[in-house]
């Protein structure tokens, strides 16, 4: 599962394919990001011509037109990553809660819409500290626009993090099975997909820079409707 705003590097080897061969990169069908009990995007920015959410589709096609010689080789060992240990977090037993929900006509984080130059005390961290954050994509049973649950790709500015765990509500397990094998949670990230009813724990170190940094949903309709906040790194 590749979230809006998320990036991965792919090494593709076409050397054994014949000239004229075509290879497609396809997005497979899934249901785990469906708007629970509602319609696509809750009616926001929707179109009758848009494909169904989770539909299979071809992303792009590659055609082999000629043979070339290439000397690039993958290294025997990739660079080691400076991974953190969950137990080293200052709040290892009580992760910082980040709740995503719909409040009236606004998408909010911890019940708060975006404020340009503000970070609340609960959004303030210490420079060089290691923390766990727990992002919860709350279902909204009585939500307007029939938007009871949507996927949120959450992007943090100024820091890279590790995904250390995912949990999903039992009633959403069937949809979860269609997406769980598609996650690439290894390594360091700055964007993570959080499905409806899902709980995701992140581990990160706030180093090098102090100041105000944004964190937000990378679905632009949600970000523009308020699902964006700041956190502050203090020395």
What is the meaning of each model-derived region?
Residues 1-167, 205-212, 216-235:
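Extended terminal and domain-junction accessory segments
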Residues 6-10, 190-192, 198-204:
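Short strand-edge motifs at loop-to-beta-strand transitions and within beta-strands
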Residues 129, 150, 188, 198-200:
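Exposed loop/turn and edge beta-strand positions of beta-sandwich/beta-sheet ligand-binding modules
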Residues 169-198:
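Generic long, charged, amphipathic alpha-helical segments
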């Amino acid at each position: 599962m590749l979230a809006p705003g998320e990036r991965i590097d792919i090494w593709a080897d076409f050397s054994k394919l014949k000239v004229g061969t075509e290879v497609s990169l396809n997005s497979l069908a899934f249901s785990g990001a469906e708007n629970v009990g509602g319609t696509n995007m809750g009616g926001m920015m929707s179109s009758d011509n848009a494909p169904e959410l989770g539909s299979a589709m071809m992303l792009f096609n590659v055609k082999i037109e000629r043979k070339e010689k290439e000397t690039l080789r993958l290294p025997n060992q990739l660079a080691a990553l400076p991974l953190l240990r969950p137990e080293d977090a200052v709040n290892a037993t009580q992760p910082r809660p980040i709740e995503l929900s719909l409040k009236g006509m606004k998408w909010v984080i911890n019940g708060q819409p975006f404020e340009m130059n503000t970070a609340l005390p609960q959004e303030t961290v210490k420079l060089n500290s290691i923390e766990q954050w727990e992002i919860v994509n709350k279902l909204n049973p009585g939500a307007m626009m029939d938007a009871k649950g949507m996927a949120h790709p959450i992007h943090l500015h100024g820091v890279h993090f590790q995904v250390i765990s995912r949990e999903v509500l039992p009633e959403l397990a069937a949809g979860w099975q269609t997406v769980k094998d598609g996650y690439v949670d290894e390594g360091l990230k700055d964007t993570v997909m959080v499905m409806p009813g899902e709980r995701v724990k992140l581990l990160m170190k706030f180093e090098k820079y102090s100041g105000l940094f944004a964190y937000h949903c990378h679905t632009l309709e949600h970000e523009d409707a308020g699902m964006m906040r700041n956190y502050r790194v203090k020395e």
